């Protein structure tokens, strides 16, 4: 019997393939992105120490937008970039989390680039 793969399993498999190649350091942390139905989350991770350096999401108190659309994702990208620049982090490695580089993921990346992050 053939078994149909669901989207979440396929995304997890893609994410594992991407994570084999992408590694964040303290000088150039990994910008990890997660997308749910209602919100979008981003964090800068130092994989050497295993610590989150900066995080931003559409579920934060200061967020004035909708996390389930592209405009909200762009705002989260700008928020993460501003927090990173405050900590002196300019260069990052982008980890799309197994999601296709399209829609909200792409807007978050473009918002972070516009606000000053380099990747």
From Swiss-Prot:
Gene Ontology MF: a single term: 5S rRNA binding
GO CC terms in record: cytosolic large ribosomal subunit
Gene3D superfamilies according to UniProt: 3.30.420.100
Protein's UniProt keywords contain rRNA-binding: yes
GO biological process terms, semicolon-separated: translation
Keyword presence, RNA-binding: yes
Lineage: superkingdom: Bacteria
Protein's job: This is one of the proteins that bind and probably mediate the attachment of the 5S RNA into the large ribosomal subunit, where it forms part of the central protuberance.
Subunit structure: Part of the 50S ribosomal subunit; part of the 5S rRNA/L5/L18/L25 subcomplex. Contacts the 5S and 23S rRNAs.
Similarity comment: family membership: Belongs to the universal ribosomal protein uL18 family.
Name of the protein this chain belongs to: Large ribosomal subunit protein uL18
């Amino acid at each position: 019997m053939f078994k149909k793969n669901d989207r979440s399993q396929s995304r997890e498999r893609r994410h594992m393939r991407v994570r084999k190649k992408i590694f964040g350091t303290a000088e150039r942390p990994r910008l990890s992105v997660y997308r749910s139905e209602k919100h979008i989350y981003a964090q800068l991770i130092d994989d050497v120490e295993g610590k989150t350096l900066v995080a931003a999401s559409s579920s934060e108190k200061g967020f004035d937008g909708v996390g389930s659309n592209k405009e909200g994702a762009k705002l989260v990208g700008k928020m993460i970039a501003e927090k990173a620049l405050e900590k002196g982090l300019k260069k990052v490695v982008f980890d799309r989390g197994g999601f296709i580089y399209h829609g909200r993921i792409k807007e978050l990346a473009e918002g972070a680039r516009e606000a000053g992050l380099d990747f």
